[in-house]
Design a protein with these regions (language model features):
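Conserved beta-strand core positions
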Residues: 35, 61-63, 116
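A short, gly/pro- and small-residue-rich
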Residues: 100-107
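Short, high-confidence coil segments that cap the C-terminus of an alpha-helix
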Residues: 60, 82-83, 189
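Conserved strand-loop elements at the edges of beta-sheets that form or border functional pockets
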Residues: 67
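Periplasmic-binding protein-like
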Residues: 84-88
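Signal peptide-proximal N-terminal region
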Residues: 52-64
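Sec-dependent N-terminal signal peptides of Gram-positive bacterial secreted proteins and lipoproteins
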Residues: 1-26
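Exported/periplasmic ABC-transporter solute-binding proteins
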Residues: 20-52, 71, 75-78, 90-91, ...
């Protein structure tokens, strides 16, 4: 009789413990996740605003950005860098990753567009009103064309306008578009070619001329989830969030042009 009573008490205890465990599982918050986003340097300001809004809605996800030139970021991904999502400033760099199987085409889209502009320091002593005046300069900065999309577009534009050969020896190459902007801001160069979004972010430069669309390849920013992401679910959530109305308004506020087209 005593043994039965003890067994009965043990069963009650086991039921109580299993019940508490089930409740704890139900009430346990989502596990903290750190999401790594590799993004073009020109997206820096806009993405910080989107990150803040996203993290408020998804408190268990911490977004960490790795900003740089799209070509350099592409190389990092092919070499196995732990990245969850890539937001590029160049379609060719992005499409190469899709072709090589690093990005799922079904989880990729062309998100925004941009424009290429010629900028000069606001306090410049040289009268530069457009691309035709670049022969007056001593130094002009563009991104390294092989790794910096803005540099690639800049070279295309200057070649199209038959200016490249005349100024090639004056070119100061930069690691990304933000470095070009810094050179112009500090008067280290007489002019630079950057995205319109970067020019609008600086009170120290002014736009001398905007490159016509037919002078260079279309400036499109695609984004996509990395196939071997350790956090594919959360990466897809951020990917979807990038394309919602609130995020598009933030991007457009910084000068980007909305596209929102699936690839």
């Amino acid at each position: 009789m005593k043994m039965r009573y003890i067994l009965f008490l043990m069963m009650l205890l086991l039921l109580a413990v299993s019940g508490c465990t089930a409740i704890q599982k139900q009430e346990a918050p989502d596990k903290k996740v750190e999401l790594t986003i590799s993004a073009a340097a020109s997206l820096q300001d806009a993405l910080k605003g989107i990150k803040n809004a996203f993290e408020k809605e998804h408190p268990h996800i911490k977004v960490v950005f790795n900003f740089g030139a799209s070509g350099a970021l592409q190389q990092q991904i092919t070499q196995g860098a732990p990245v969850d999502l890539f937001f590029s400033a160049a379609e060719d760099k992005f499409d190469q990753l899709v072709h090589e199987g690093f990005i799922d085409k079904k989880k990729s889209a062309d998100v925004v567009g941009n424009e290429l502009v010629l900028v000069v320091p606001k306090d410049s002593n040289i009268d530069i009103n457009g691309f035709d005046d670049l022969t007056k300069t001593e130094k002009i900065s563009i991104g390294t064309p092989e790794t910096v999309p803005a540099g690639q577009y800049a070279k295309e534009t200057l070649e199209h306008l038959n200016v490249w050969k005349a100024i090639e020896g004056k070119v100061v190459y930069a690691k990304d578009v933000r470095q070009v902007l810094t050179y112009v801001e500090l008067n280290n160069v007489d002019a630079g070619m950057v995205y319109k979004t970067d020019a609008l972010s600086s009170p120290k430069v002014e736009i001398a001329e905007t490159a016509k669309e037919n002078t260079h390849a279309p400036i499109i920013y695609p984004a996509g989830v990395i196939k071997n992401s350790s956090h594919s679910k959360e990466a897809k959530q951020f990917y979807d969030y990038l394309q919602n109305e609130a995020s598009m308004k933030i991007l457009e506020m910084y000068g980007f042009k909305g596209l929102n087209e699936s690839k």
